[in-house]
């Protein structure tokens, strides 16, 4: 076994792609049922009215309407959908 690294050897050179998390739809934007609103790990943003949550904490719209972000009970962030009339 060599005690010196060979020429051109590198221990770097690997990286993983990003996981595309974050807010996908911002406040007062229009959405249709099924649109993904937030991709997250854990409940950084909690679901409000007309918003569902997947098993990976993804928040999605249950109805067509307008997105509304608000705060409740201290610093808890909530996203809701105001349905179109």
Curated annotation (Swiss-Prot):
Keywords: Ribonucleoprotein, Ribosomal protein. Signal peptide: none annotated. GO terms for molecular function: structural constituent of ribosome. It comes from the Bacteria. Residues 1-22 are annotated as: Disordered. GO terms for cellular component: cytosolic large ribosomal subunit. The keyword Ribonucleoprotein applies. GO terms for biological process: translation. It holds the Pfam family Ribosomal_L27. Belongs to the bacterial ribosomal protein bL27 family. PANTHER family: LARGE RIBOSOMAL SUBUNIT PROTEIN BL27M, RIBOSOMAL PROTEIN L27. This is Large ribosomal subunit protein bL27.
């Amino acid at each position: 076994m060599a005690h010196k690294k060979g020429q051109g050897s590198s221990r770097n050179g690997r990286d993983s792609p990003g996981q595309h998390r974050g807010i996908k739809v911002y406040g007062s934007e229009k959405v249709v049922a099924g649109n993904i609103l937030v991709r997250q790990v854990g409940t950084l943003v909690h679901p409000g009215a007309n918003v569902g949550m997947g098993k990976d904490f993804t928040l999605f719209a249950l109805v067509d309407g307008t997105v509304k972000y608000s705060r409740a009970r201290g610093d808890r962030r909530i996203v809701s959908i105001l349905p179109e009339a």
